[in-house]
């Protein structure tokens, strides 16, 4: 397996990562375990999940149990921001939600740190300054190693870059957007923005 640095960070990840969206929904625990063990056998060290995957965090729960004996050898990426229940502060990028969401993910994953913590989508109701300050606090506390974004447009990624610079806060190191042979829209603006600003 080849390894690459993620963005402009020192974090090395396997060239191929395993998406765990189906764990807890289409794949039960034993099926998920078989998939993860095969991935480990093939040299995959990057595992991507989210609090919302599997319905109510089951993907994180499955992944945490399966990787328990391999924690120091793998990179766990998870996301927050999608709706996780009824009532206020159950989604988005507010400080209040982020601080609760990270504790919930840490508990489900059975770990004391998350390698890569990503906002699942932009939050139009919360200033990016608030989101970045909260994430920076988590990095300083050691609960999160690196931060990233998912489903951001190029202008949002660029704005976040310059806001993090202005605040002297931890910057995003990753962008996780839909990209495949049929959907190559990110090549027009997001990829050049990430190449320019990290």
Give, region by region, the residue ranges found by the protein language model:
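Conserved, mostly hydrophobic/aromatic
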Residues: 6, 18, 32, 47, ...
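Active-site beta-loop-alpha junctions enriched in small/polar residues
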Residues: 21-23, 50-52, 79-83, 119-122, ...
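Beta/alpha (TIM)-barrel catalytic core signal, keyed to glycine-rich beta->alpha loops juxtaposed to Asp/Glu
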Residues: 126-198
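Active-site mouth loops of central-metabolism enzymes
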Residues: 20-30, 84-99, 120-126
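N-terminal binding-site loop/beta-alpha segment at the start of enzyme catalytic domains
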Residues: 1-75
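Short, well-ordered coil/turn segments that N-cap beta-strands
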Residues: 11-16, 43-46, 70-74, 110-115, ...
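Generic structural signal for well-ordered alpha-helices
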Residues: 3, 36, 60, 64, ...
